[in-house]
Each structure stands twice: as C-alpha cells, then as structure tokens.
C-alpha cells in the first residue's frame, strides 16, 4: 500500500498520524502551531476531523447530555457546548492542508 511517497506495510517503518482534533482552542494560529509541532516530532501525516455540534449531539441540558464524571476535565459541561468549543471550521481546511504540505506531511 502507498500513501503519498511512503510504502506502508510489513518491513517498512510505521506511518505515524497526528490527530489535530479540537486541540486548537478555536485558534487557527494554534492549529498551525500544532501542525508544526507534529512535523517536528517526525509524524508522517495530520488527521483532521470537522464536525458541527448539531451533527454530534442534541442541544439539550438533561443529564444524558451533561458530562457527569467528576474526574473529567469537562465535568458538568453540556456536550453541545463542548462540541462547539472543539469544532474546527471548514474554512481552515485549506490553510491547514497547505501548512501540512509545506512541511512534507500528508493530510487526512
């Protein structure tokens, strides 16, 4: 199997993918810094998820839609609001793609 210029499979080095996810804290600058940090760590690719809160959950405040684990960093937060914070705007894709490409990374 081939991904970009890399052969994937037995007797080949692992293909390492960094997940950008919502770790950008709603900042394109942070997102680009994370891409750079991943490249500095030697990853082969960046994976990006884009979703909207509406595609993940309902905008409800009942117990089923609140994080109740007191050990969680997101304790007592509504899922819908949490997904709003983690949302990666579609408009960022091209910029992140170009940064990944400039750094020699594949982009998913």
Where are these regions (language model features)?
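N-terminal amphipathic alpha-helix/helix-capping segment at the start of soluble metabolic enzymes
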Residues: 1-17, 93-94, 98
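Aromatic/hydrophobic pocket-lining residues that form the small-molecule binding cavity
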Residues: 31, 89, 93
């Amino acid at each position: 199997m081939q991904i970009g210029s890399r052969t994937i499979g037995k007797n080949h080095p692992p293909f390492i993918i960094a997940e950008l996810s919502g770790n950008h804290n709603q900042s394109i600058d942070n997102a680009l810094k994370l891409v750079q940090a991943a490249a500095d760590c030697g990853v082969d690719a960046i994976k990006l998820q884009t979703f909207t809160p509406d595609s993940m959950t309902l905008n409800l405040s009942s117990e089923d839609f609140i994080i109740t684990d007191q050990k969680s960093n997101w304790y007592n937060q509504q899922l819908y609001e949490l997904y709003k914070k983690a949302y990666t705007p579609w408009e960022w894709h091209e910029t992140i793609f170009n940064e990944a490409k400039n750094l020699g990374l594949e982009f998913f």
